[in-house]
Amino acid sequence: MKALTVRQQEVFDLIRDHISQTGMPPTRAEIAQRLGFRSPNAAEEHLKALARKGVIEIVSGASRGIRLLQEEEEGLPLVGRVAAGEPLLAQQHIEGHYQVDPSLFKPNADFLLRVSGMSMKDIGIMDGDLLAVHKTQDVRNGQVVVARIDDEVTVKRLKKQGNKVELLPENSEFKPIVVDLRQQNFTIEGLAVGVIRNGDWL
C-alpha cells in the first residue's frame, strides 16, 4: 500500500468508522460535510486518489459505492510503533497481517503488538517479540496489560488501588510506573494473551 497523505488518511478513517458504526459507507456529501470540504466533488477527488493507491474500490452508479480493500486482509493486524496521541489500531500503525488463528489464544487475540524494550524479559517477553493482545478494558490486578499513559503505550503487569495504578515491569533493572488517575490520562488498550517469538510465524 502506498503511503496516504494526512487528508487521505482522514477520509479513509471516516469511511472505515462509518461502515463500522452504520454498516454502510458514507455518501460523498456526508464525507464533505464531516471533513469540511466545500462540495461532494472535493470528496470524490480524495476517493479517486484512495482508489489509485489501492485502499478502496469505487463502485460506479451508487452514492455509497465505496468498498474498503484493506479490510479484506486476513490474519491478525500487527501494530508497530504507535505515534503519540493516536489510536493504537490506526491504519498507519499497522505493519501488516499475520496468518495466526486468533483462537490459539484464550481469550481470542484481536491484534499483535511489536514489543519494544526488555522491561518484561523475566516472563519471556523480549524486545522485538509479537505480543498477542485481546482488546478489552476488563482486566484484573496481576494481569499483563497493554496500557496507555497520556500518550505513551506500554506493556506491564497491572496493580490498581484506588486512584493509583502501578505498572510493574518483569525486569529488576526497570522501575514501576506509578500513575495518578486524578492527574494523568490512563487507558487499558488490551490484555496480553500470548507471545510469538519474532520470526516463528513468518
Swiss-Prot record:
Q: Which residues bind DNA?
A: 28-48
TM spans (from-to): none
Q: Report any one BP term from Gene Ontology.
A: negative regulation of DNA-templated transcription
List residue numbers at the site (Cleavage): 84-85
Query: What Gene Ontology terms describe what this protein does at the molecular function level?
Result: DNA binding; serine-type endopeptidase activity
Q: What CDD domains does the record point to?
A: S24_LexA-like
UniProt keyword Repressor present: yes
- Quickly give the catalysed reaction: Hydrolysis of Ala-|-Gly bond in repressor LexA
UniProt EC number: 3.4.21.88
Q: Which InterPro entries match?
A: LexA, LexA-like, LexA/Signal_pep-like_sf, LexA_DNA-bd_dom, LexA_repressor, Peptidase_S24_LexA, Peptidase_S24_S26A/B/C, WH-like_DNA-bd_sf
Function according to Swiss-Prot or TrEMBL: Represses a number of genes involved in the response to DNA damage (SOS response), including recA and lexA. Binds to the 16 bp palindromic sequence 5'-CTGTATATATATACAG-3'. In the presence of single-stranded DNA, RecA interacts with LexA causing an autocatalytic cleavage which disrupts the DNA-binding part of LexA, leading to derepression of the SOS regulon and eventually DNA repair.
Indicate the quaternary assembly: Homodimer.
Name of the protein this chain belongs to: LexA repressor
